[in-house]
Amino acid sequence: MNINPNNVEIIISAVKPDQYPDTGLKEVALAGRSNVGKSSFINTMIGRKSMARISSKPGKTQTLNFFNIDEQLVFVDVPGYGYAKVSKTERERWGKMIETYITTRDNLACVIQLVDIRHNPTEDDRLMYDFLKHYEIPTIVIATKEDKIPKGKIQKHLKIIKQDLDMDSSDTLISYTALSKDKNPMIFNAIEKYL
């Protein structure tokens, strides 16, 4: 899959189904804890520095942000989960918004769940993965921030993630750093299987 980074645009920020765009394209949702690196992941994957806003403040994404990727697919950036400084009401609202999107959206082809390779998956990570499996949503798990651990320990950390999430053998697990585009073809190939 060849992406022209000059042909990427944010279509809409939505909070409810009647605001979802009608592109006819398949969608790939990006889910993960606040500050796991979703915005950096999007920017690196599409080869644009600031398409998705990067913030050191967790909980910045509060809507479903739809990005048209070169008229080939749509990335949907969903609010990060597990951020304690947001009110319980707000967290529940985000949770409902994400659940509605994932369980009702016909265009959804798969979900990329991002986890931090440096740490064991959290309870929230496990709940999200189990939720996706319950609804039989194809899932690609991306272990971000691989540049933060020694190369020799990457496989060990991936094994822990696979075990902790009790991953299906059919699901893909890829380690990743936003500092390099080397893994982009591998990730786009994994996505393409579901389009």
From Swiss-Prot:
TM helices/strands, residue ranges: none
GO MF annotation, one: metal ion binding
Residues in EngB-type G domain copies: 24-195
Alphabetized UniProt keyword annotations: Cell cycle, Cell division, GTP-binding, Magnesium, Metal-binding, Nucleotide-binding, Septation
GO biological process: one example: division septum assembly
Gene Ontology CC terms: cytosol
Binding site for Mg(2+): S39, T61
Binding site for GTP: 32-39, 59-63, 77-80, 144-147, 176-178
Cofactor: Mg(2+)
Family in the record: Belongs to the TRAFAC class TrmE-Era-EngA-EngB-Septin-like GTPase superfamily. EngB GTPase family.
HAMAP family (UniProt xref): GTPase_EngB (MF_00321)
Function recorded in the entry: Necessary for normal cell division and for the maintenance of normal septation.
Cited PANTHER family: ENGB-TYPE G DOMAIN-CONTAINING PROTEIN, MSS1/TRME-RELATED GTP-BINDING PROTEIN
Protein name per UniProt: Probable GTP-binding protein EngB
Organism of origin: Macrococcus caseolyticus (strain JCSC5402)
Gene name for this UniProt entry: engB
